[in-house]
């Protein structure tokens, strides 16, 4: 029969293991990855009819998730104005600072960009690897740019009228490039050399002047890059840009898919390697620009956020 001293020694030795086993059995479930959202042209971070609604939907579908909807400016009015008139490179820099300072994002986050917010968040992924972006979802983003005049009916229609006139007057002039957001991803397939030399944003993040290896490495670090294309899009021209396709160089009628572009065949951004590794996801949806139902969003987007 064991002595009292031996029993006490055995109990002392087993106690930490018992406590550890009990603790492991009562661990809280891991928190879902945080989510960062960037709105599109003429929208704001917190519009209850758009990004505010998306934020609430995600929070309902994924309990406990932290959602940050980026506000570029001091308030919603500035946020809307900046989506038209603040240099995109400055906007991306501001977004990077916001993300870097947020303690809830330091272990990584997922991101959803709506319309132009899609290519803006891709720029964040390429330029600012800290904190790390895990999955990027681009909903109607224009990753090869646009070559069509923007249409935005409603309250912003007068601004779009001004944008059309400015782009017609000279999309690649220095003053238009520096002061008009949409000019900074204007891609003229008939004037490719002018575009490459004068585009202050898109030509840079698409590696069309020179190769920045860090851009490539940072984008390839994504777990998934999801692109949503709208078949009946009346805003984005060409719509293939939403899947990284574009017009064949030298004309503006025939479009080619991503896999036939120089960007892909020369793998200037790492997209070819990502495609082969199964990291690129192409989703298609009937309907016009950003026309998304709650049911579609829940079925096709929410699974990437868990």
From Swiss-Prot:
Keywords: Disulfide bond, Endoplasmic reticulum, Glycoprotein, Golgi apparatus, Hydrolase, Lysosome, Secreted, Signal. Glycosylated. One of its GO terms (cellular component) is dendrite. The keyword Hydrolase applies. It is found in: Lysosome; Secreted; Golgi apparatus; Endoplasmic reticulum. Disulfide bonds join 45-46, 96-128, 152-160. InterPro entries: AB_hydrolase_fold, Palm_thioest. It is an enzyme of class 3 (hydrolase). This is Palmitoyl-protein thioesterase 1. It comes from Rattus norvegicus.
